[in-house]
Amino acid sequence: MSKLIKGIAASDGVAIAKAYLIVEPDLSYDSNEKVTDIESEVEKFNDAIEASKIELTKIRNNAEAQLGADKAAIFDAHLLVLDDPELIQPIQDKIRNDKVNAATGLDEVTTQFISIFESMDNEYMKERAADIRDVSKRVLAHILGVDLPNPSLINESAVIVGNDLTPSDTAQLNKEFVQGFVTNIGGRTSHSAIMSRSLEIAAVVGTKSITEEVKQGDMIIVDGMSGDVIIDPTEDELIAYQNKRERFFEDKKELQKLRDADTVTVDGVHAELAANIGTPDDLSGVIDNGAQGIGLYRTEFLYMGRDQMPTEEEQFEAYKKVLETMDGKRVVVRTLDIGGDKELPYLDLPKEMNPFLGYRAIRLCLAQPEIFRPQLRALLRASVYGKLNIMFPMVATIKEFRDAKSMLLEEKENLLREGYEVSDDIELGIMVEIPATAALADVFAKEVDFFSIGTNDLIQYTLAADRMSERVSYLYQPYNPSILRLVKQVIEASHKEGKWTGMCGEMAGDQTAVPLLLGLGLDEFSMSATSILKARRQINGLSKNEMAELANRAVECSTQEEVVDLVNQLAK
């Protein structure tokens, strides 16, 4: 008899295969072992560190090849942990001073670090604890000579089942064999969910008990649209879901027919669908999915995975490649957004209690022109190879925009004096991520050429709710009327001055949000490339005038639930 488990739908698709249960390895050891050769234990620890570096570098490179540099960046953080003398030295000292074995020294010191970070009322520090936990587990396995689960060894059709999938696990998934996965924990914005959408495999997360219900090799169905997981399905269920799977793939083929189509509503209003990218490697997905431009090029990934700042020439070549490939379509490049959750090993950033509200993005760039100016020069030089727009992230005041623009104009003059060509048709804009910026949108609109609303941060700053914290996740509300009112305010301010507004957060490609954003007058929707064709089909079936009426009603609602009900009534 089959069993139905409910979870959170994380990635579209239907997977039907045998369960591959990720079993946690036995990493137990004897902490009371008498150690006679202390230096051999230190050497064992050092060897385990080096072996872990080699392993993680391979995993990182595999992740970059399959998923792009932005998804591989998590492993740069893990490699930083393995190179951190503030962690490595205390472990070596522990082994020598307390005369304990390598496993004990590692475990006791990392446990202390993890405990300290987790006790901080700061989600960024808690994420560092997760990095240390993941890395220390790998090092401990090497010390003990134990193999960690390796999904890359799967050589037949399978559905991965586990408590959660670590970044290392997801980076090793082979799309040829892995049809989908199911986890006990996680939500739609968890790392494993985001990775599953990049891999385009079915996923259900947050089932709470899947590992207790499934045995190795059980036949399992994963419905990534509904969040249903069926263990040991009946013959009728297998047939029904095989049909649903076929329909899903047929639908994907149908969507491909829209690749070169216009995005235009039934009443003749055009919308622009653009893609978010992290590196030039992402361009093939942009082209394959019919993007009409790039609405967000995250340049920070040029700076990651290396031990020194990229040169002006390296940056120029990357920007040039993107602009040339897009062949005259608009490319919106975000200047360096480092700090917060993104660190660089060669940049000594101050440790802050809340780095998301601290020294990051445009604040850092204006304070360190030796970092900012080479990027501006590279962008200006590349501008003659396509349609370049530049936007500054995390702008809170009009002075920050003016200072950044002034620096850019200075570098333009310098380049012209040096004999370089620079386009005269570059638009300058800002990310709207801070409520203060949205509140002063009418002031900014007089000076910027465009706005791009970064909803991921705007939502958490407006509702004072960390989107990575499970305890307050109920407050992370994209459809809260307060968010919709801010979005409306920004769009109206830009249109009043003859400017345009885009959106590059997760919300831009959300099927519930699209009708509302269309109704509010959003000009550009920038999203993951894999979401573009679905959004095009949705918009092409909507009336702009009707969506404007819907949006006007939505901003008068009191709660997110009321807004969602309004949109759901539209679908009926």
UniProtKB/Swiss-Prot annotation:
Enzyme class: transferase
Swiss-Prot/TrEMBL cofactor(s): Mg(2+)
GO terms assigned for molecular function: kinase activity; metal ion binding; phosphoenolpyruvate-protein phosphotransferase activity
GO CC annotation, single: cytoplasm
Keywords for this protein: Cytoplasm, Kinase, Magnesium, Metal-binding, Phosphotransferase system, Sugar transport, Transferase, Transport
Gene3D superfamilies in the record: Phosphoenolpyruvate-binding domains, Phosphohistidine domain, PtsI, HPr-binding domain
SUPFAM superfamilies, sorted: Enzyme I of the PEP:sugar phosphotransferase system HPr-binding (sub)domain, Phosphoenolpyruvate/pyruvate domain, Phosphohistidine domain
Record field: catalytic activity: L-histidyl-[protein] + phosphoenolpyruvate = N(pros)-phospho-L-histidyl-[protein] + pyruvate
Source species, domain of life: Bacteria
Known EC number: 2.7.3.9
Keyword Magnesium assigned: yes
Location(s), subcellular: Cytoplasm
Biological process, per Gene Ontology: phosphoenolpyruvate-dependent sugar phosphotransferase system
Note: The reaction takes place in three steps, mediated by a phosphocarrier histidine residue located on the surface of the central domain. The two first partial reactions are catalyzed at an active site located on the N-terminal domain, and the third partial reaction is catalyzed at an active site located on the C-terminal domain. For catalytic turnover, the central domain swivels from the concave surface of the N-terminal domain to that of the C-terminal domain.
Assembly: Homodimer.
Its biological purpose: General (non sugar-specific) component of the phosphoenolpyruvate-dependent sugar phosphotransferase system (sugar PTS). This major carbohydrate active-transport system catalyzes the phosphorylation of incoming sugar substrates concomitantly with their translocation across the cell membrane. Enzyme I transfers the phosphoryl group from phosphoenolpyruvate (PEP) to the phosphoryl carrier protein (HPr).
Notes concerning its domains: The N-terminal domain contains the HPr binding site, the central domain the pyrophosphate/phosphate carrier histidine, and the C-terminal domain the pyruvate binding site.
Protein name as annotated: Phosphoenolpyruvate-protein phosphotransferase
Source lineage: Bacteria, Bacillati, Bacillota, Bacilli, Bacillales
